[in-house]
Amino acid sequence: MLRLLLLLVPGSGLGVLISQFPRTAPQRRGETIKITCVQNKTSYTYMYWYKQLQGERPRLIAQSVDVSSTTHEKEYNASKFPITRPNTKISFMSIVDLRTQDSANYFCAASEHIVL
């Protein structure tokens, strides 16, 4: 059984509230999990998804600008980590065909501006 810890980041910018669920998600190998991220500011058009292995810094999986565009980092395949964004305040990320190496903390963030 894989253990995923989904962190709640109480806003990546001053004044934004982020809710993420499920909070924890023990899953079985081969399954798919869908993580939901909701933020409360329509002006925060940038949303980010991160993966953090124990003892390491968070690594950006992908970022989306509004609902029109999602860009994955080179090491994260869009078919493994598909992201949908039905509106400015919500983003969904799935992790497809779970493997042992997918065990990590996953979290989302939102910003008014691009984060480099």
Where are these regions (language model features)?
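N-terminal V-set
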Residues: T42-N77
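Solvent-exposed, conformationally flexible loop/turn segments
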Residues: R28-G30
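Extracellular beta-strand/loop-rich beta-sandwich domains predominantly from IgSF
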Residues: R23-P26, D66, H72-Q101
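Structural signature of extracellular immunoglobulin-like
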Residues: T32-K41, Y46-Q54, S94-D97, D102-E112
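N-terminal Sec-dependent signal peptide, specifically the hydrophobic helical h-region
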Residues: M1-R23, A110-L116
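Short glycine/proline-centered loop/turn elements that form peptide/ligand docking sites
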Residues: G15-T24, Q39-Y46, E56-R57
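Residue-level detector of conserved, well-ordered beta-strand and adjacent loop positions
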Residues: P10, S19, V38, Y50, ...
